[in-house]
Amino acid sequence: MRKAFALLVIVASLSLFIPSAFPAYDSAAVKAAMEKLPQHMTDIQTKSAARDYYGAAEGFMEVARLIKKLDVIVPVKGEKAIWDQNHRNLINAAFKGIGACGAQNDAAIKEAIKELIKYRNESHKIFK
């Protein structure tokens, strides 16, 4: 009986602690990020087309920063593990874009942009 009571106390304590371990879903932050993302993507495309590789690299870094800020959020819809993996994929695609800018490789920049769009679309299918 004591074991059952102790287990009940532990479960009750954890149920109070675990929800506070992650921030609540911040729809305003997610919405603001999703409004900024297309702006950054347009900026990257414009700057890379003008062969402003430094400016395009800054745009890719802004995308990585934007997505990284959303890492702590627990999605209302979908699994947190998938949310985290998708964010890692988006950030890695942005880093590939930065590397492509450093190499002044227009084809690789376009591929990085396609990859960002792919992961953004996948994320929207799951979490939107």
Where are these regions (language model features)?
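Bacterial N-terminal signal peptides that target proteins for export
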Residues: 1-9
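Solenoid-repeat scaffolds in large eukaryotic assemblies
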Residues: 55-57, 63, 109-110
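Bacterial N-terminal signal peptides
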Residues: 8-17
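Short, solvent-exposed, charged loop/turn and helix-capping segments
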Residues: 66-84
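Immediate post-signal-peptide N-terminus of mature secreted/exported proteins
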Residues: 22-57
